[in-house]
């Protein structure tokens, strides 16, 4: 079974008046097709357009705002919304972060969920950093995203949630469920100058597509190459070598470095290329930390392995793994491969590792399994008693997003949870759910509810 998006999908924007449906409609259609006004209820009919986020194209429906209204006009507006829901493959259920959850939001969410359609809760008007309040979970949606339709922020996260929720379609040629088929896996190759990034890509695609040579810094801007690997659409992105900021003086190199850093922001997976003759410098660790902080998945590749003496390879690996696991705890267990791009040794293993870690990066864990694990783990190693004999407890957790896996944990006193205890939970989760090498994010929320 393979997740493939073959026919153009239909997405309906549903919500009460003035939550920003028409603004998002205009944003996704790339042109102004819907009238937008602060006055509620401007939209009265279903409107259709071709929408797009990145390379993903779909049909989009704007619907009238729902209000509990028994008169015939209100019923006719609701009929428009009902028809849109019936037509849609996916519902974007929109709410307004400024006003919070209102009774009409709850009524409409109950109505929408009766149709058992894939749905994403879209929390609009989030111009500033937004923390998902537990009130939003009461609407009953297991997928949610914060955006600003007016300013265009959160569109990448919206894309991720939509793709994850769209129905799967059978593919006769597929043997296993593979979440990247039908999508484009963007792989950025990053590292210090002269680590062999361009040589690696040339070897992978079996073409001298990129200029290479012994001189450091040949690549000055990010180069994208579309490629197919085992039936998967791959976009390989070669980037300029990244030196320490203090050593960068020329304006052109500053632009190249900025371009390379920007490419990492939009990557799915980053290959960190390291020169075996000059392994694990501070700049390598800086790049890896930046990738983890951006929430990207990472694969570490040690190139020029053919230049290391056979008698020294075992000791090299032991020291290398020790340094990686002690200096990069945020991606503990990250895969490391040892290759020779020049001799095309082990280069296919790199792509297999990228696909595997991409699946881990996309992993979704059910709430029941999470809390079964949480109860066992916190009972095995509880937090110490506080003054007065009261114990800090982590009572409940849920996964709020993937890419990277992000979790919300409810506690009676979250400010007392130490960094070391969080590391204990994260490391335990990696082992329990087989999640090596990807950033795992925990967000703690204070709750006084004894049942949550």
Curated annotation (Swiss-Prot):
A single MF term (Gene Ontology): GTP binding
Keywords: GTP-binding, Nucleotide-binding, Repeat, Ribosome biogenesis
Membrane-crossing segments per the record: none
Binding-site residues for GTP 1, renumbered to this chain: 15-22, 62-66, 124-127
Domain EngA-type G as annotated: residue spans: 9-170, 185-362
UniProt: GTP 2 binding residues: 191-198, 238-242, 303-306
PROSITE patterns in the record: G_ENGA
Name of one Pfam family that matches: KH_dom-like
GO biological process: ribosome biogenesis
InterPro entries in the cross-refs: G_ENGA, GTP-bd, GTPase_Der, KH_dom-like, KH_dom-like_a/b, P-loop_NTPase, Small_GTP-bd
Residue ranges constituting the KH-like domain according to the UniProt record: 363-448
Gene3D superfamilies reported for this sequence: 3.30.300.20, P-loop containing nucleotide triphosphate hydrolases
HAMAP family on file: GTPase_Der
Biological role stated in the UniProt entry: GTPase that plays an essential role in the late steps of ribosome biogenesis.
Subunit description: Associates with the 50S ribosomal subunit.
Family that this chain belongs to: Belongs to the TRAFAC class TrmE-Era-EngA-EngB-Septin-like GTPase superfamily. EngA (Der) GTPase family.
Name the UniProt record assigns to this protein: GTPase Der
Organism of provenance: Rickettsia bellii (strain OSU 85-389)
High-level lineage: Bacteria, Pseudomonadati, Pseudomonadota, Alphaproteobacteria, Rickettsiales
Gene that produces this protein: der
């Amino acid at each position: 079974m393979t997740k493939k998006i073959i026919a153009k999908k239909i997405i309906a924007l549903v919500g009460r008046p003035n939550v920003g449906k028409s603004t998002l409609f205009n944003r996704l259609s790339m042109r102004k097709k819907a009238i937008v006004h602060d006055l509620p209820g401007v939209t009265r009919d279903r409107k259709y357009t071709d929408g797009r986020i990145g390379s993903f194209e779909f049909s989009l429906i704007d619907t009238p705002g729902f209000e509990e209204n028994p008169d015939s006009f209100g019923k006719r507006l609701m009929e428009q919304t009902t028809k849109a829901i019936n037509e849609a493959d996916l519902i974007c259920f929109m709410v307004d972060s400024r006003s919070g959850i209102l009774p009409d939001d709850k009524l409409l969410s109950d109505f929408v969920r009766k149709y058992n359609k894939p749905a994403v809760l879209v929390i609009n008007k989030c111009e500033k950093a937004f923390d998902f309040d537990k009130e939003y979970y009461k609407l009953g949606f297991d997928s949610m995203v914060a955006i600003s339709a007016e300013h265009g922020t959160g569109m990448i996260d919206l894309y991720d949630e939509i793709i994850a929720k769209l129905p799967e379609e059978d593919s006769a040629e597929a043997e296993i469920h593979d979440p990247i088929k039908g999508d484009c896996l963007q792989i950025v190759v990053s590292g210090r100058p002269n680590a062999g990034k361009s040589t690696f890509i040339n070897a992978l695609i079996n073409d001298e597509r990129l200029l290479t040579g012994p001189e450091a810094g040949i690549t000055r801007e990010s180069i994208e190459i579309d490629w197919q690997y085992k039936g998967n659409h791959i976009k390989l992105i070669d980037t300029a070598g990244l030196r320490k900021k203090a050593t960068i003086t020329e304006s052109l190199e500053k632009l190249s470095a900025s371009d390379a850093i920007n490419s990492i922001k939009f990557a799915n997976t980053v290959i960190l290329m390291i020169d075996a003759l000059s392994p694990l410098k501070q700049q390598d660790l800086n790049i890896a930390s930046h990738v983890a902080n951006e929430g990207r998945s990472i694969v570490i590749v040690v190139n020029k392995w053919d230049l290391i003496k056979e008698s020294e390879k075992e000791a090299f690996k032991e020291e290398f793994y020790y340094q990686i696991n002690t200096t990069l705890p945020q991606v503990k267990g990250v895969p490391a491969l040892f290759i020779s791009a020049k001799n095309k040794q082990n280069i296919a293993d790199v792509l297999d590792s990228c696909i595997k870690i991409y699946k881990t990066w996309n992993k979704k864990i059910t709430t029941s399994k999470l809390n079964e694990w949480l109860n066992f783990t916190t009972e095995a190693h509880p937090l110490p008693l506080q003054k007065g004999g009261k114990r800090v407890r982590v009572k409940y957790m849920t996964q709020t997003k993937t890419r990277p896996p992000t979790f919300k944990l409810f506690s009676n006193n979250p400010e007392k949870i130490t960094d070391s205890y969080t590391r204990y939970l994260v490391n335990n989760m990696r082992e329990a759910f087989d999640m090596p090498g990807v950033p795992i994010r925990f967000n703690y929320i204070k709750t006084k509810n004894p049942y949550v």
